[in-house]
Structure formats: structure tokens, C-alpha cells
């Protein structure tokens, strides 16, 4: 006997599922996890540029600027900002030595 005949039967009104155990806690938990996974996947696809740019550049702290002249600080900040402002999803990492 095939799995199709055990689960679904073709009737005049269409395909019907004979699943009487849909109140099983395992089925409910799997449904909730599936829905949450779908929601998180949609958010990831919608906001992936913001999320990954924040993770890659926002959490890193630059080197200490104590004792560095103000002009060099501004130059470093401009180079750091230009590395983050790259469009089209391409990231550039500038390492200053």
C-alpha cells in the first residue's frame, strides 16, 4: 500500500487529509518552530545589509586615538567611514598599519 493512499484520499470535493492527531503537542511545536523559522528567514532577507554591516563594522572598536594629533584622527575616521559606505553589498576592510 502506498503512503498516498494512507494519508490522502481523492473525494468528490477534492483532496482531504485524514490527520486526526493534529492536536499532538509535537505537531504543534513543529508548526510553531516552522512559522518562527519562516519569519526569521524573511527578516534576514529583508534586512541582511543592515544586520551584517552592523555586525562586521559596528561592533569593532578602532585603536585608541590617545596621543594622536587631531588631523590624523579625522583622516582615520574618514577612511574608516569610506570603507563602510561602499554600496552594492560589497564590503571593503581597510587595515591601517
Curated annotation (Swiss-Prot):
Gene3D superfamilies: 6.10.250.1640. A lipid is attached at residue 50 (S-palmitoyl cysteine). The lineage of its organism: Viruses, Riboviria, Orthornavirae, Negarnaviricota, Polyploviricotina. The M2 protein from most influenza A strains is inhibited by amantadine and rimantadine, resulting in viral uncoating incapacity. Emergence of amantadine-resistant variants is usually rapid. InterPro entries: Flu_M2 (IPR002089). The modification Phosphoserine is found at residues 64, 82. Keywords: Disulfide bond, Glycoprotein, Host cell membrane, Host membrane, Host-virus interaction, Hydrogen ion transport, Inhibition of host autophagy by virus, Ion channel, Ion transport, Lipoprotein, Membrane, Palmitate, Phosphoprotein, Signal-anchor, Transmembrane, Transmembrane helix, Transport, Viral ion channel, Virion. The chain crosses the membrane at residues 23-43. Glycans are attached at residue 20. The keyword Protein biosynthesis does not apply. Residues 44-97 are intravirion. Cytoplasmic tail plays an important role in virion assembly and morphogenesis. The record marks 41 as: Seems to be involved in pH gating. The gene is M. GO terms for molecular function: monoatomic ion channel activity; proton transmembrane transporter activity. This is Matrix protein 2. Homotetramer; composed of two disulfide-linked dimers held together by non-covalent interactions. May interact with matrix protein 1. Forms a proton-selective ion channel that is necessary for the efficient release of the viral genome during virus entry. After attaching to the cell surface, the virion enters the cell by endocytosis. Acidification of the endosome triggers M2 ion channel activity. Its main location: virion. Belongs to the influenza viruses matrix protein M2 family. Residues 60-84 are annotated as: Disordered. It is found in: Virion membrane; Host apical cell membrane. When the channel is activated, one or more imidazole moieties of His-37 probably become bi-protonated. It is a single-pass type III membrane protein. The record marks 37 as: Essential for channel activity, possibly by being protonated during channel activation, and by forming the channel gate and the selective filter. GO terms for biological process: protein complex oligomerization; symbiont genome entry into host cell via pore formation in plasma membrane; symbiont-mediated suppression of host autophagy. One of its GO terms (cellular component) is host cell plasma membrane.
